[in-house]
Amino acid sequence: MKISKRGLLEIAEHEGIVPGPYLDSRGVWTWGIGHTAAAGAQDPEAMARGMPDDIDTAIIGALKQFDRDLDNYERRVNRAIKVPISQHQFDSLVSFDFNTGGIFKARLTQRINAADPNAADSFMGWLKPPEIRRRRVDEMRLFQTGDYSADGDAIKVWRVDDNGHLRGLDRVMHGDDLLAMMKARR
C-alpha cells in the first residue's frame, strides 16, 4: 500500500515544515517535515544553521526529503502489518511510524496482526513527549473511523534561529500547494 494524499496532508499538518535544522521537543536535530538522522540520509545536525536564504527552494528540498521518508515508512508498515487493512488505517499507521519509528516493536502492531478489535487503543501507549497526545488521538480516530483531522488548509512553515530554536510562523501553506509542489514526485 501507499499513503493517500489525505494521509500525506495529515502528517504534514501535524509536523509542520521547518526549512532549517531545529531541535525538537526531545532535543533531536530535525529538519523539513519531521526528518531526523534516524530516518536516513541527510543528517539535520550536519546542516547549516538558521533560516536558508532561499526559503522556497529549501521548502522544495524538504518536500523531496519528505517524499523519500514516506517511501521508507510505507515499506516499514507494509512489512509489519500481516493482515488486510483499509487505506485510512494504513495512513494512520504510517503517521504513527513516521513520528515514533516504533511500528515493529509496538503493541499496536501485535494487536492489529492478532485481529484484536480494540487494537487502536494501543496508539495511546505512545505518549512521550506529553504534547504528542493530540496526534495519537487523531491517529487512533483515523484508524478507527476514517476521520482525517487535517483538511490541508493549515500546514505551518516555521522560522528557526541559528541555535535550532523555533522562532515563530513564517507562513501557512495550503495542502493543495504542498501537493502541487510534490506532484512530480508522487
Predicted features along the sequence, with ranges:
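Long, amphipathic alpha-helical surface segments
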Residues: 1-9, 14-20, 26, 37-38, ...
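Generic hydrophobic/packing signal
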Residues: 8, 31-32, 58
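Short, conserved, surface-exposed binding loops centered on an aromatic residue
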Residues: 21-23, 84-85
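Substrate-binding/active-site groove segments that recognize
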Residues: 23-49
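Low-complexity, intrinsically disordered short peptide segments enriched in small/polar/basic residues
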Residues: 30, 52, 56, 152-154
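Structural recognition of the beta-strand scaffold that forms the well-ordered cores
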Residues: 30-32, 92-97, 121-122
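Short, intrinsically disordered/low-complexity patches at protein termini
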Residues: 43-44, 54, 142-145
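Alpha-helical segment that forms one wall of the substrate-binding/catalytic cleft
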Residues: 45-81, 87-109, 117
